[in-house]
Amino acid sequence: MDAASGILPDYAELFCRSNFSFLHGASSAEELVERAAKQGYRGIAITDECSLAGAPRMHVAAKAVGLPLVVGAYFGVTPDDAAPGHDPGPGAFGLVLLAQNREGYGNLSELISWRRMNAPKGTYRLTPRMLAAPPRALAHLRGVPDCFAILVPTYPARADVLDAQLAWFDALFGERARLGLVQLQRALDGAHREQVRAAGERRGMHIVALGDVTMHIRSCKPLQDTMTAIRLGMPIAECGHALAPNGEQHLRTRQRIAQLFPADALAQTCRMLDACHFSLDDLRYEYPHEIVPAGHTPTSYLAQETWAGARRRYPDGVPDTVRQRIEFELALIADLKYEPYFLTVYDIVKYARSKDILCQGRGSAANSVVCYCLGVTEVNPQQSTLLFERFLSRERGEPPDIDVDFEHQRREEVIQYLYEKYGHDRAALAAAVSTYRPRGALRETGKALGVDPMLVERVAKEHRWFDGSRDLLARFASVGLDPEVPLIRTWAEIAARLLNFPRHLSQHSGGFVVSRGKLTRLVPVENAAMEGRRVIQWDKDDLEALGLMKVDVLALGMLSALHRAFDMITAWRGPPLPDGRPFRLEHIPQDDEATYDMICRADTVGVFQIESRAQMSMLPRLRPRGYYDLVVQVSIVRPGPIQGGAVHPYLERRRIAAGEAHGEITYPSEALERVLERTLGIPIFQEQVMQIAIVAAGFTPGEADALRRAMAAWKRKGDLGKYHERIVAGMLERGYSREFAEQIFEQIKGFGEYGFPESHAASFAKLAYASSWLKRHEPAIFLAALLNSQPMGFYPPAQLVQDAKRHGVTVLPIDATKSGWEASLEAQPGAAPPDGRPAVRLGLSLVRGLGEEAARRIGAARAAGPFASVDELARRACLERRDLEALAAANAFATLAGNRRDALWQAVAAAPERGLLAAAPIDEAVRPALGAPTEADDVFADYRTIGLTLNRHPVALLRPALDARRLSSAAALRDRRNGRLARACGLVTARQMPGTAKGVLFVTLEDETGCVNVIVRPELLERQRRETLDSQLLAVSGVWQCESDVRHLVAQYLEDLTPLIAGLRTESREFH
């Protein structure tokens, strides 16, 4: 501080790590920026360790408050001869690199990529030799040009070591070299400061003040200590000097900083800040050039392919409205120079189709007629009220987002195609930031605090998937711990603070970034956990914030199932047309009455998108009878319409339209009638909200899209409030009442909870109908396709098989003499191809402990001739003992050896001996008499070995005992009158708590006659938490409710009857 004037010196923090320096930084980018701005800093740097993962978030936060940001990174530099993983000794030092311009940023990004890709995931190593003499291909990185380099000496500094380091440092970095001074009020700060001052003076090197910041405020110190303990894998009490001695690594006041550092060191921070001219806004994405053939520009090639596709889509002539729309879209795409993006996606889709990989674009891309003509999407925009501005507009200021789903079992082929075409140096997956969830946070913090491991596990297991941070103390109390005990309260507080902190980078589900030049100069790239893949350090939100392109190559299980089903139909029934082409999506008859009858009954187990509890409850009320009804059905069971109060008014208007209720469907204006007519005056889709803003409040299409994005982010960022006055004023100006305007705004807020775009729903509705048609008309093929496409969907194989059997499908057991690896079709008597219903033979893939290679050898041996015995099968297929035991336990030898117990005996006898007993004589004639297993034994063994049974349902075995307890079956409850008391019991197959359910848990029970839907209200859930969440076999007493074919049991009391099926390994799935 200037003693004469009392003016605080300017200061910029140039050494600051966020929580993206995993388990080092204890504050988020947003917290750091807010604190720096509040303290009046001139600027701040983001210098996460060998990472730029936190830079986009820091950039957005700093830009919002007008705080200059320097992009950099910190590295721990170890001596050349230091063994990795060992104490590097006094020769180690810290290195802060700060990008001065775009070239320097590219060099920094490439350096990070090089070191990350040459080390195990999550680690890196940097030595002086690497900086001074990188490999020939990276020779341009020598000395990391266009970056400031700050040497941070090991504390406390030693004159001899520091002099040697500075001599090397100065020779390598020259005028960009700086010597960093850190003052954290440690015991040897004075001596350290003097050594740094003297060394800088001897070398003529500028000294710069550094805060070595890892948190925004001092009170984060307990969290930082806990993270240190987690990182080191030991309790805090054992961390010793690894812990920071105090809380000084926060963004201190300028007054405090002025007391700690020389004026020149403070001034140097601002001089360096002013010399750094790079911003992440300077990044410019360059599209690949390979996708344009010789003789074409991107504009001409996109136009050529679009018009060719239009002629295929409209063989009777392209309608004038479509022609005009194509011309408009092509002109806008050319004006924004996005043609290469469309062509990149088009190339990917063309490749997939050439390999007969089912794919379908979805999301906002379905709003585009160009995407439809290119074959990227399958939804004709002419058949709906899709809004192109939801996809692309001038005001949007960022590339469009095209999501393409591929068969989940073949998506890897598409990913490898991208790597092969563009090379690993130009293509990588976007990151997904894995964050701390409640159980993980409780476990990690509990261990760090030294809590007994058994107690840690008890508390963690008590916290379920739907519990939030507010529930932490309640969970401690539920296991008998006093929340007022200081240790328990500290544990809860630190665990809550750690929630949602970045834990590590994983790979996005399919967001691909492809560049014209080296991708590593745009963003750091590191190895993914999966071999053969690389991942950038930014996630999809970071890419969107910076306006950078990604292509979403997503996996969808239902596409795999549909493709398999279509191939089975072709093989079983023959080609659908004389031209011999295989059965495909377009061959499914539209508007099939029997299919819609099934959908209206909510008979949709296994069907895409409409198989969840919430969807099944809505189906009998909405009663879809056509494609657009399915579009609405897919969309309406979402938080947006539910929170926006759209569901009940829409259902009531459907009843009015059908003549089942009195009333009139009215619209506030003709303009809004055009927007809302298809949904009877009720906004269901995101596009409708945007259109309301345009026609009723005077928004431009681009402004409406900004509103849509604000809706998506308002819960997280609170950005929606600024639109309130604009919407209300705009609607008042156009003659709408204030009451109606406020109602519209509340509905818009509801859509902030996640409203479905119509374009997305339109794509999904096609697959929902296709899978429904298959379930109704080809149930055996549908089952086989689903089984062969696992894991996918809402239901595990056991429930899929039980449902198929209730629909008359014959399911045959696993048989080593007949089964392949996958489920297959077999003719039944009188039902040979192409007529009649086939039976489904379960595949060997269900057998736990059996590998695909062993199954392949069985198939190859079987092709050479039938097996006469287990011993012959074992010998010809070269099976190991573990393979034979797995098959015997799964009853796959029934045709060769009788029951399980006999089969297991024969399997052991047939197994090749190894080691000392290989030559021992064995008298196989002596064989004990083995009793046949009971039906219950077989059922339990089925679940244990293949996860399902073809015998009687486990609950059927208990029916006499359940009858004695007056517990009804699902079938008996169907005719129960509304409002009557009822009792039921079944295996728990699903637990679901949607975010809009206000704490209500939906439980599905399955017995031998069907399923019972149970509603557990929050107060009962809290009172009987263990019974609700831990039971495999659950008895429920409550009130039976049935209305409009919607039936459920509202629970009043729960009883865990799992001991009745002790040892049965069933599976239930838990969902938000």
Swiss-Prot record:
Superkingdom of this protein's organism: Bacteria
Keyword Transcription regulation recorded: no
GO BP annotations, alphabetical order: DNA repair; DNA replication
GO molecular function list: 3'-5' exonuclease activity; DNA-directed DNA polymerase activity
InterPro entries in the cross-refs: DNA_pol3_alpha_NTPase_dom, DNA_pol3_finger, DnaE2, DnaE2/DnaE/PolC, DNAPol_HHH, PHP_dom, Pol/His_phosphatase_N, Pol/histidinol_Pase-like
Record-linked CDD domains: DnaE_OBF (cd04485), PHP_PolIIIA_DnaE2 (cd07434)
EC assignment: 2.7.7.7
Assigned protein family: Belongs to the DNA polymerase type-C family. DnaE2 subfamily.
Function (record text): DNA polymerase involved in damage-induced mutagenesis and translesion synthesis (TLS). It is not the major replicative DNA polymerase.
Entry protein name: Error-prone DNA polymerase
Gene designation per UniProt: dnaE2
